[in-house]
Amino acid sequence: MNIHRECRSLLSLIQIVSGNLPTGGFSYSKGLESAIEYGWVKSLEDFLNWQKQWIHEQLIYIDWPMLKRCYYYTKINDSKNFKKCALQILSYRDTYELRLEEQRRGKAMEKLISQWYDPISDSWAVAFKCSGLASMAWLGYEWNIPIKNLALGYAYNALESSIMVGLKLLPFGQRTAQKLLRYLVEFLPNAWDKADLVKDHEVGGNFLLQSIASACHEDQYSRLFSS
């Protein structure tokens, strides 16, 4: 029985982080498209530095700590504090496009959750619509996905999506893309250990270059991605 539960948990994790579902990230670049357009990211080294900065600034100090807190509030059925966390996540998306992406993912997740878990109270549904990350935490708990696995799956999806952006806009091919992904995921276990210890007053990152690139992307004339 436990083996079957672990299998269901693994399959649920694969589904929840899939980039091909409405909640996926392959249509977003989070400012990376503009960074490449303006020459801030023009080599593999630049690309790797961008991703590592995302891991060490945003993932460790914003995304994972907030995912963990939303997961906890789901566990204790505290919709009030869950909503506060969802709004806090949204406040950390400090450009129009980053906020819009977070809300679009949240609304897509809310529609799926409402179909699978009917009825859902308004207090939860409103929070889901605010944040895709918060919605993922709720669904991850409901699907018995351990928080560490959920966090690693989220990060893997984000890195894979960024590499897909690079694959389209930078001069490297599929084999290099696989090597990049393999290299970057090696940072994740230690990164999670750090994120797991982040206290409430320490939450908050400063990936300033991403914010600037995202703001520039709003007015970019020709673009392939939504952010």
UniProtKB/Swiss-Prot annotation:
A cellular-component GO term for this protein: cytoplasm
Family annotation (Gene3D superfamilies): Urease accessory protein UreF
Subcellular location: Cytoplasm
UniProtKB keywords: Chaperone, Cytoplasm, Nickel insertion
Keyword Cell membrane: no
Record-linked Pfam families: UreF
GO molecular function: nickel cation binding
Source superkingdom: Bacteria
Predominant subcellular localization, coarse grouping: cytoplasm
Segments passing through the bilayer: none
Family the entry assigns: Belongs to the UreF family.
PANTHER family reported in the protein's UniProt record: UREASE ACCESSORY PROTEIN F
Role: Required for maturation of urease via the functional incorporation of the urease nickel metallocenter.
Subunit relationships: UreD, UreF and UreG form a complex that acts as a GTP-hydrolysis-dependent molecular chaperone, activating the urease apoprotein by helping to assemble the nickel containing metallocenter of UreC. The UreE protein probably delivers the nickel.
UniProt-recorded name of the protein: Urease accessory protein UreF
